[in-house]
Structure formats: C-alpha cells, structure tokens
Amino acid sequence: MTEYKLVVVGARGVGKSALTIQLIQNHFVDEYDPTIEDSYRKQVVIDGETCLLDILDTAGQEEYSAMRDQYMRTGEGFLCVFAINNTKSFEDIHQYREQIKRVKDSDDVPMVLVGNKCDLAARTVESRQAQDLARSYGIPYIETSAKTRQGVEDAFYTLVREIRQHKLRKLNPPDESGPGCMSCKCVLS
C-alpha cells in the first residue's frame, strides 16, 4: 500500500486542524486550540488505489516557525491553507510556499492552495484572487469548509493526485530535444 506524507500549512486560526479532523474523524471541531504539531493516519481509496495518508497538522504560530524546516523536509505534498475571511492569511501563503521550495530545494513541489471557511458570508479574499494566485504557482485551488465538509476530501485527494503526477514526472522526465522534436530517434546508415 502506498503511503503519502501530507503536510498542512498556513497561518494560525485558518482551520488546518479542523480540516484534518473533519477528514479523519468526520466531525467539526469548533473550539480553537492552537496546534504545536499533530500527526494523523487514515487509509483511503483514491482512484481505485488503496493508500495510507500520513497527515502532519502544523503550528501556524510564528513562535514555532523553527520546526517548519524539519517537517517540510519529510513532506511529499503540502496543503497551503488560508481563510477566505482573513486577507493576511492569504498574503502569508507566499512565505509558506517560498519556505517549502527552499527547504525542498525545488520549484516543483506538489501543493494545493486551499481557501477554507467558505461557509462564511464575510469573505475578504475573492475566489478570483485565489484562483489567480494558484494559476501563477501552477497548482490547483480548492475552497473548503471544515464545518460543512465541503471540499475537504477533494482538497486532500487532489494533493495525493498531485504527488502521483510529480512522481511520474520524475520517472519519465520530458524529452528536452527541443521544440517541435518528437521523442523518436533516427539512425541513418
């Protein structure tokens, strides 16, 4: 069974733990209890493949930022979460992404941008802004509500699909013989 190491990152209070617990335990936690670091495991079937999700729910508080490099090193894919009613959390996404790329020493790291709390009417980050940011990063964008469960499975499962595609790209790198060239080789005698 394939195991996927997923890491949930984002500013404090955006609902990282609520999303993770909603996926794992099917219930909404509405009291805010700041996380230092929690790990969860769940067996799921995604696109016909049984797999084990190893999910690391991380601290959003700045005082725990020193721990980030360590879990970023081991993570295969990252849910970058902001709250749609918190513009600052959206602006912080860039820093998380840059730190992930630096620690992984790669521009090609599986990520999904997640706009959480979409059940709330008091939106300060428009869908279009988030879609534009995700497009500029070349990653998917999914809106979720940990409260109603909307998009929760989709966010985590999309990240697993991104990891799978990343692994395939590493196994079969694109042919770099130039534009317009086919990958077949000719031998003239």
Curated annotation (Swiss-Prot):
InterPro entries the UniProt entry points to: P-loop_NTPase (IPR027417), Small_GTP-bd (IPR005225), Small_GTPase (IPR001806), Small_GTPase_Ras-type (IPR020849)
One Pfam family per UniProt: Ras
Proregion positions: 187-189
Any one GO BP annotation for this protein: signal transduction
Keywords, in A-Z order: GTP-binding, Host cell membrane, Host membrane, Hydrolase, Lipoprotein, Membrane, Methylation, Nucleotide-binding, Oncogene, Palmitate, Prenylation
GO (cellular component) term, any one: host cell plasma membrane
Superkingdom, natural source: Viruses
Keyword Hydrolase in record: yes
Protein's recorded name: GTPase HRas
Organism per entry: Murine sarcoma virus NS.C58
